[in-house]
Structure formats: structure tokens, C-alpha cells
């Protein structure tokens, strides 16, 4: 069963009122232990023509991983990023529906480790 996650109005990634942002809608799946969003990233976020800027891809992955803490807990479990490593495997096309998926790997006190991936329509990462 999935549930829509709340968003912050002005957040660059999820803010519904941030006209300059991505306005991603996030859902939690408690059974799968995942957070996911489906989004077609507009061309204004190009790095090169037709390709999403790597910083925007990284922002989506960062947001997804931070939101994994909300699957079991609440806003008191919000996390901030201390360290993040991204491996870019292929370009992400703009204006194409993609799925961002994140899972919490481990949580100990105020520290957590999560992983995320961005899937293209053909299922590739």
C-alpha cells in the first residue's frame, strides 16, 4: 500500500508552490520499504540539450534518500545529508518520465544510510 508523503511548499525538489522547482510528488510504500516519485524533468533543467543537468539528478536522489526516514517515522525523523556518492551510468533525458526510488539500508540513532536510483522508462538505471 502506498501513501503520499507531505511536501514543503518552497522546496526546490518537492515544493508545490515553487514555480522554479521540480515539484516532485513522493509516495511511501511501507511494505516494500521504499519511497518513489515519477517525474518528467522539464527542459529548463538541461545540462546539455535534451539531457538533465547532473546536479538536478543528484538533488532528486538526495531528496529521495532523505525521505526514506519518513516511511516508518514522521517529520521528527527528518535527515540531512552528511555524505553522498553518485555514480552516473547514462544520461537522463529531459521531458521523459523517470522513476526515482530510494530505500533505507540502515538507521542507528540520528544516522542513516540509504540508497537511491533513477530508472528510465525502459527500466534501466
Segments and roles (model prediction):
Residues 1-4, 92-94, 103-125:
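HotDog/MaoC-like acyl-thioester-processing domains
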Residues 23, 81-83, 113:
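Hydrophobic residues on conserved beta-strands that form the core of alpha/beta folds
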Residues 19-20, 79, 109-111:
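Short solvent-exposed loop/turn micro-motifs enriched in small/polar/acidic residues
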Residues 36-63, 71:
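A conserved, well-ordered hydrophobic junction motif at loop->secondary-structure transitions
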Residues 64-99:
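Hydrophobic beta-strand-centered segment that forms part of the acyl-chain substrate-binding groove
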Residues 1-44:
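Non-catalytic linker/capping segments at the edges of enzyme domains
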